[in-house]
UniProtKB/Swiss-Prot annotation:
Residues 23-48, 89-115 are annotated as: Disordered. The keyword Cell membrane does not apply. Belongs to the HIV-1 REV protein family. The lineage of its organism: Viruses, Riboviria, Pararnavirae, Artverviricota, Revtraviricetes. InterPro entries: REV_protein. Residues 36-48 have a biased composition (Basic residues). Homomultimer; when bound to the RRE. Multimeric assembly is essential for activity and may involve XPO1. Binds to human KPNB1, XPO1, TNPO1, RANBP5 and IPO7. Interacts with the viral Integrase. Interacts with human KHDRBS1. Interacts with human NAP1; this interaction decreases Rev multimerization and stimulates its activity. Interacts with human DEAD-box helicases DDX3 and DDX24; these interactions may serve for viral RNA export to the cytoplasm and packaging, respectively. This is Protein Rev. It is found in: Host nucleus, Host nucleolus; Host cytoplasm. GO terms for biological process: mRNA transport; viral process. GO terms for molecular function: DNA-binding transcription factor activity; RNA binding. Escorts unspliced or incompletely spliced viral pre-mRNAs (late transcripts) out of the nucleus of infected cells. These pre-mRNAs carry a recognition sequence called Rev responsive element (RRE) located in the env gene, that is not present in fully spliced viral mRNAs (early transcripts). This function is essential since most viral proteins are translated from unspliced or partially spliced pre-mRNAs which cannot exit the nucleus by the pathway used by fully processed cellular mRNAs. Rev itself is translated from a fully spliced mRNA that readily exits the nucleus.
Amino acid sequence: MAGRSGDSDEELLKTVRLIKFLYQSNPPPSSEGTRQARRNRRRRWRERQRHIRSISAWILSNYLGRPAEPVPLQLPPQRLTLDCSEDCGTSGTQGVGSPQILVESPTVLESGTKE
């Protein structure tokens, strides 16, 4: 791993193997049985997954001294926009964050209506 010493690489690999083992110890539930039984198995599986996720975060923070999630990306104070002055295609939207509904020409809309 670039920029790290060999010792911390070994520790990181050991930690990743441990976390991988935790996730592998909780396979997805089977799809057999009644709807209620399947629902209960999925609910218990999701609860175990949440528990494994919290244990993994604890392992990462305590043994490696780093948070489980990366540090959030700091965005510039001004809004990010895309310049659509060039050909942007015919997707029916313009710009970012302001979806436009693609409107068909009136002749197409009128062809199927009876007045």
